[in-house]
């Protein structure tokens, strides 16, 4: 992807929860961007040859000298700069302005009034005030505020509690915004970012699925040559897109290993083998390891221990199959850009203990002695989906709800047994089927069933019975960091409950989880 990455837009991260959202908004414009720590090395910066820089927000306060600052050389680089929230405040302080903590903090919506003309905000408005001023509805999240402009800057917008809500030095193409244009609550936020990125930075807009695929194929062929590549295919979005991309790039040089853990969704193994094996012609080695996984999980109830056992057992099975293939030189993984960002951020943080391992193939042993191939490591999840569609993968596969790496193992709140997995598989399939039938599936972010290890009395015909409880979970979220429980219609839930109790032997009661995140997590374990 070298040509598409020429002169990218850089985002320097000061720790904001919205940093990745900024990058996703920039990518939506067809512009390639990368996220780097705020203290990026000058030599590395020069090699990247960026077209412009965005300074993100962050949780710190610039009123403390020890807190993060942008490299001072950045302000002498002659590149367009945009500081957002904390990014604006550190820009102001480092260029000679003043920032103070405010007693009138702003969190949430605010009405922004534009001042005169600025290249960044001109002709962008939600409505007009009585005096003719342009007004914008924006999203604020700050306690500090700029109280004195740096030399050369002018005020470009204000709110009731922040007289300097935006500033600009047009001659040096430096801009600061106290609000967050990257969040959807700022209605014109994408237009504002586009004004900076495309109009001011003159960024190239060639970052499209077609171009991404073309560049990726060229890079794969250049790296791999005539050597063979091994991929652990799970049926999830990331590994599916990698499989389709590699198959298009190198054809029969790709070998996939699919491990049936016994903890997959109903008919999932058959669907994966049919789609990639029979229809696409990819060579797949299918391994039924259900007994091995269930034996390893016998007697284990601790969620974290279950995860470790499932991960360790997968590695053993995968390694065993890989050792049989003596002509493999490469191991492909479905690493995506958020994984890369997380790993980079954690590696520079002494307090960080655990990096989330990549589903299924994360932590494969060094004894494989294979070279690593990560063809989608520069893509966000939504970009992976767009590439998948462009490669011809079915919409329902590409937009399937997330499924945890340990599978049903962490949706059975007890020791994992085949009986429990079979009950849960059937109940979950009914829930998902009815969501599709009611055209609700793609309106929610994630839905699944959970097996509860308690028995509840029920009545079937003239008899009483004690059977298990199934809990249904459905959430709506943008980033999976926070989530609302989905307010599905009661008659719909009643229909699903009735079907599960009548069609799944061993279930006497169905409940619905109405917990948000926080305080709950999306998964139960």
UniProtKB/Swiss-Prot annotation:
Domain named Glutamine amidotransferase type-1 is located at 8-206
The protein depicted here goes by the name GMP synthase [glutamine-hydrolyzing]
Binding-site list for ATP = 234-240
Source species = Legionella pneumophila (strain Paris)
Q: Does the keyword Nucleotide-binding apply?
A: yes
The top EC class, named as a word, is: ligase
Molecular function per GO: ATP binding; GMP synthase activity
UniProt lists the gene as guaA
Q: Which residues form a coiled coil?
A: none
């Amino acid at each position: 992807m070298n040509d598409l990455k020429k002169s990218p837009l850089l985002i320097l991260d000061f720790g904001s929860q919205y940093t990745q959202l900024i990058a996703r908004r920039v990518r939506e414009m067809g512009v390639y961007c990368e996220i780097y720590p705020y203290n990026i090395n000058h030599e590395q910066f020069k090699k990247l040859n960026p077209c412009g820089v965005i300074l993100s927000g962050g949780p710190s306060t610039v009123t403390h000298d020890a807190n993060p600052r942008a490299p001072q050389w950045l302000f002498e680089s002659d590149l367009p700069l945009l500081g957002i929230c904390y990014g604006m405040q550190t820009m102001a302080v480092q260029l000679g302005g003043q920032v103070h903590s405010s007693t009138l903090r702003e969190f949430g919506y605010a009405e922004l009034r534009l001042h005169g003309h600025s290249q960044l905000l001109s002709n962008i408005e939600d409505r007009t005030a009585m005096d003719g001023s342009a007004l914008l509805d924006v999203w604020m999240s700050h306690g500090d505020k700029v109280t004195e402009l740096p030399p050369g800057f002018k005020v470009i917008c204000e709110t009731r509690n922040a007289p300097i809500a935006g500033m600009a030095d047009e001659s040096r193409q430096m801009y600061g915004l106290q609000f967050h244009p990257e969040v959807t609550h700022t209605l014109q936020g994408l237009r504002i970012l586009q004004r900076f990125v495309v109009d001011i930075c003159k960024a190239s807009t060639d970052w499209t699925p077609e171009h991404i695929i073309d560049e990726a194929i060229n890079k794969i062929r250049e790296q791999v040559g005539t050597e063979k590549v091994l991929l652990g295919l799970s049926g999830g979005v990331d590994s599916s897109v990698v499989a389709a991309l590699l198959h298009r790039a190198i054809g029969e040089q790709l070998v996939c290993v699919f491990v049936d853990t016994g903890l997959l969704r109903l008919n999932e193994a058959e669907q994966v083998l049919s789609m990639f094996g029979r229809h696409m012609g990819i060579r797949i080695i299918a391994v039924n390891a259900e007994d091995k996984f269930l034996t390893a999980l016998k007697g284990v109830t601790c969620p974290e221990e279950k995860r470790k056992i499932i991960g360790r057992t997968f590695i053993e099975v995968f390694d065993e199959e890989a050792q049989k293939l003596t002509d493999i030189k490469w191991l492909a993984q479905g690493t995506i850009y958020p994984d890369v960002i997380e790993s980079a951020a954690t590696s520079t943080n002494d307090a960080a203990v655990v990096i989330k391992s990549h589903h299924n193939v994360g932590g494969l042993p060094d004894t494989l002695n294979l070279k690593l191939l990560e063809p989608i490591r520069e893509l966000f999840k939504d970009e992976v989906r767009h590439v998948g569609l462009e490669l011809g993968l079915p919409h329902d596969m590409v937009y399937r709800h997330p499924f945890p790496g340990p599978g049903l193992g962490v949706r059975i709140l007890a020791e994992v047994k085949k009986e429990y997995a079979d009950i849960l598989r059937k109940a979950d399939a009914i829930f998902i089927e009815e969501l599709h039938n009611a055209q609700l599936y793609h309106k929610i972010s994630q839905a699944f069933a959970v097996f509860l290890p308690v028995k509840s009395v029920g009545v079937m015909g003239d008899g009483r019975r004690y059977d298990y409880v199934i809990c249904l979970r459905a959430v709506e979220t943008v980033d999976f960091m926070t989530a609302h429980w989905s307010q599905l219609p009661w008659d719909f839930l009643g229909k699903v409950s009735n079907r599960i109790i009548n069609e799944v032997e061993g279930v006497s009661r169905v409940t619905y989880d109405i917990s948000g995140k926080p305080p709950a997590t999306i998964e139960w374990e």
